[in-house]
Curated annotation (Swiss-Prot):
Cross-referenced Pfam families: GatB_N (PF02934), GatB_Yqey (PF02637)
GO biological process: glutaminyl-tRNAGln biosynthesis via transamidation; translation
Gene3D superfamilies attached to this UniProt entry: 1.10.10.410, GatB domain, N-terminal subdomain (1.10.150.380)
Organism of this sequence: Agathobacter rectalis (strain ATCC 33656 / DSM 3377 / JCM 17463 / KCTC 5835 / VPI 0990) (Eubacterium rectale)
EC code(s) of this entry: 6.3.5.-
The protein's enzyme class: ligase
Name of the molecule in the record: Aspartyl/glutamyl-tRNA(Asn/Gln) amidotransferase subunit B
Protein family according to the UniProt entry: Belongs to the GatB/GatE family. GatB subfamily.
Taxon lineage: Bacteria, Bacillati, Bacillota, Clostridia, Lachnospirales
Gene: gatB
Swiss-Prot/TrEMBL catalytic activity: L-glutamyl-tRNA(Gln) + L-glutamine + ATP + H2O = L-glutaminyl-tRNA(Gln) + L-glutamate + ADP + phosphate + H(+); L-aspartyl-tRNA(Asn) + L-glutamine + ATP + H2O = L-asparaginyl-tRNA(Asn) + L-glutamate + ADP + phosphate + 2 H(+)
Sorted UniProt keywords: ATP-binding, Ligase, Nucleotide-binding, Protein biosynthesis
Length: 475
């Protein structure tokens, strides 16, 4: 079999975090009752006219600046004409000829090192409604709440060569956009969606192969599986002497396979023409400067600051800053208790373990920095020991309980009175003569059994190090 190279480009749609839609005052809130966040504008009623939401432009420019794009200072909207039930106007207001941002790049890092992925353009557009096919066999229903929600579409050049590079690119984009506050980028809620354009060609060939577009990719895992599946399908066709058809394919995560949806359209198929109801967008130097001045600290700068300000290893700083949400928790808890390394340890070890056990990502963390800081202080003061602290943290992780109140109500404070502890230890010694004899006969491991029995007798409230010290004294 010949050696093949995979060529991948992405179209990433990101719902912007505005309170209202791109061309009307309807709410963009996720999860409302069907068709309650609608009006004549976003449902395409005759006579209704769009008015551009200024915040959409500012978010688009902010993302463009953060991805090294050139900002188009004279930009226009265009009509993309197509007929589909989720599109009540029978056209979408988008940008083809003069998109808001062009010629950017993002740096990604994989096991093979660092690489720049070029961004062809970023354009603004409105989202479509949502079709639901599962209620009845012969009827589809549509919810127009999403119709008119503002999007930016980030179109990459075909610079990626593997699923690993694609995931690294998407993670970098998501982190950047979340840090900007431009979107929450939740794939499971559809606020970040990626269409994957993929082709294969013989290694060394200059000409691109025929591409297909993969849709219905709702997680990074699905994206990786779809890329591998489509790569294998195209190679199999070429090895059989058949042609790859330019088409849009729908990925089925349950079946781990895809099926053809429609032939892949080109721009001319949509009969684009300038949007007559919206004036051009003029982005002045002053406006760009204002947007740039408001930009928050992005991940690369935060990572460098953590290493310097908190003396945290680079690996830990990378984990803490992967999610803006986790970074915010870390900084807030550190500000409250003043112990960055101890806060970092709770996030790096116990939090990551519980996230993995519950198949969650860091953006799903519900506990408050206040309660994490209180837990750090309780351990630091010796009020509770490390084993009790882990029990308390699990409650914080799941229910965001107040650790001080929980420790008090459940009698979990450490036994810090050595006199009281000696009485308990002596009782353990008296009840375990064989372990005592083994210890005196040189079997040093026997002390561990006595420590364990003491911890059991104190219901885990004693400090194991103190127990060990007192046992040595009494023996």
């Amino acid at each position: 079999m010949k050696n093949y190279e995979t060529v991948i480009g992405l179209e990433v749609h990101v719902e912007l975090a505005t309170k209202t839609k791109i061309f009307c005052a309807c709410s963009t809130a996720f999860g409302g009752a069907p068709n309650t966040h609608t009006c004549p504008v976003c449902t395409g009623q005759p006579g209704s006219l769009p008015v551009l939401n200024k915040q959409v432009v500012e978010y688009a420019v902010a993302v463009g600046l953060a991805t090294n794009c050139t900002i188009t200072q004279y930009s226009k909207f265009d009509r993309k004409n197509y007929f589909y039930p989720d599109n009540p106007q029978n056209y979408q207001i988008s940008q083809l000829y003069l998109p808001i941002c062009r010629n950017g790049s993002v740096e990604i890092e994989t096991a093979n090192g660092k690489k720049n992925v070029r961004i062809h353009e970023i354009h603004m557009e409105e989202d479509a409604g949502k079709l639901v096919h599962d209620e009845w066999e012969d009827v589809s229903i549509v919810d127009y709440n999403r119709s008119g929600v503002p999007l930016i579409e980030i179109v990459s050049e075909p610079d990626m060569r593997s699923a690993e590079e694609v995931i690294a690119y998407l993670e970098t984009l998501r982190q950047t956009i979340q840090y900007l506050g431009a979107s929450d980028c939740k794939l499971n809620e559809g606020s970040m969606r990626a269409d994957v354009n993929i082709s294969v060609r013989e290694v060394g060939a200059k000409k691109f192969g025929t591409r297909t577009e993969m849709k219905n990719l709702n997680s990074f895992k699905a994206i990786a599986h779809a890329i591998e599946g489509e790569r294998e399908r195209q190679i199999e066709l070429l090895e059989m002497g058949r042609k790859v058809v330019q088409e849009t394919r729908r990925w089925d995560d349950n079946k781990e396979s895809s099926h053809a949806m429609r032939s892949k359209e080109d721009a001319q198929d949509y009969r684009y023409f300038p949007e007559p109801d919206l004036v051009p967008i003029v982005v002045s130097d002053e406006w760009i400067a204002q947007i740039k001045a408001k930009q928050p600290e992005l991940r690369p700068q935060k990572l460098a600051r953590y290493k310097k300000e908190y003396d945290i290893p680079e690996y830990d700083a990378k984990i803490l800053t992967e999610s803006k949400h986790m970074a915010d928790i870390f900084e807030a808890a550190t500000k409250l208790c003043g112990k960055p390394k101890k806060v970092s340890n709770w996030l790096m070890v116990e939090t990551m373990r519980l996230l993995k056990d519950n198949d969650m990502d860091a953006d799903a963390i519900k506990f408050s920095p206040v309660n994490l800081a209180k837990l750090v202080d309780l351990v630091d003061a010796g009020t509770i020991n490390s084993s009790v602290a882990k029990e308390v943290f699990e409650k914080i992780f799941r229910e965001d309980i107040d650790p001080e109140q929980y420790v008090e109500e459940n009698g979990l404070k450490s036994m810090n009175d050595e006199g009281e502890l000696k009485v308990t230890i002596q009782a353990v010694i008296d009840a375990n003569p064989q372990a005592v004899e083994d210890y005196h006969n040189g079997k040093k491991k026997a002390i561990g059994a006595l420590v364990g029995q003491t911890m059991k007798a104190t219901k885990g409230k004693a400090n194991p190090a103190v127990v060990n010290k007192l046992l040595m004294e009494l023996l």
